[in-house]
UniProtKB/Swiss-Prot annotation:
Pfam families: IGPD. Disulfide bonds: none annotated. Signal peptide: none annotated. GO terms for biological process: L-histidine biosynthetic process. Coiled coil: none annotated. Belongs to the imidazoleglycerol-phosphate dehydratase family. Its main location: cytoplasm. Pathway: Amino-acid biosynthesis; L-histidine biosynthesis; L-histidine from 5-phospho-alpha-D-ribose 1-diphosphate: step 6/9. The gene is hisB. The keyword Cytoplasm applies. Gene3D superfamilies: Imidazole glycerol phosphate dehydratase, domain 1. It catalyses: D-erythro-1-(imidazol-4-yl)glycerol 3-phosphate = 3-(imidazol-4-yl)-2-oxopropyl phosphate + H2O. It comes from the Archaea. It comes from Sulfurisphaera tokodaii (strain DSM 16993 / JCM 10545 / NBRC 100140 / 7). This is Imidazoleglycerol-phosphate dehydratase.
Length: 194
């Protein structure tokens, strides 16, 4: 295991989430959740993070998609934060503007330790591939809070819900990759810590 890799298990009465994440090694990505579209988006996220990841999520109660989406976001957020360690030398900031056919999405991140998010997506459909689109926004907010990453995801154009969501995950993945690269000798903050 590299020094910037993490294994996490979170188990509640509602879900069980297992994750291995290596943010420094581009390798195999395996994702298994009970929600097919979530599998697609998480695979996209990890791929564009240039990471190695294995995520298995079990929904014990099968009420709807909310619990598995939320708990998965918690685990990924906590794992990313843990993998970063003391954050010494990381680039810290990144932004992307991602086109996908009709869609154009801006993603900006600051690995500041302050998990505040602003998500502005106009998702026309209520559901896609077994996933309530309101839970896409909830995923991003929950990841931001638990990772300590300040995030803005803003839809600039687009009408196809799938394209808007996928562009958002691509942009987030690549922004997290760039912002987490070690490029400085010291912590990139006037305060001296993040």
């Amino acid at each position: 295991m590299s020094t910037r890799s993490v294994r996490k298990i979170r188990e509640t009465k509602e879900t069980k989430i297992e994750l291995y994440l290596d943010i420094d090694k581009k390798g195999e990505v395996k994702v298994s959740t009970p929600v097919n579209f979530l599998n697609h988006m998480l695979s996209t996220l990890f791929y564009y993070m240039n990471s190695t990841a294995t995520l298995i999520a079990e929904d014990k109660q099968n009420f709807d998609d909310h619990h598995v989406v939320e708990d998965t976001a918690i685990v990924i957020g906590e794992a990313f934060k843990e993998a970063l360690g003391d954050k010494k030398g990381i680039r810290r900031f990144s932004h992307q503007i991602i086109p996908m056919d009709d869609a154009l999405v801006l993603v900006a991140v600051d690995i500041s330790g302050r998990g505040v998010s602003n998500i502005e997506l106009n998702l026309e459909r209520d559901e896609i591939g077994g996933l309530a689109t309101e839970n896409i926004i909830h995923f991003f907010q929950t990841f931001s809070y638990n990772s300590g990453v300040n995030m803005h995801i803003i839809q600039l154009r687009g009408w196809n819900t799938h394209h808007v969501i996928e562009a958002s995950f691509k942009g987030l993945g690549f922004s997290l990759y760039e912002a987490s690269r070690i490029v400085y000798e010291e912590t990139y903050s006037l305060k001296g810590s993040l």
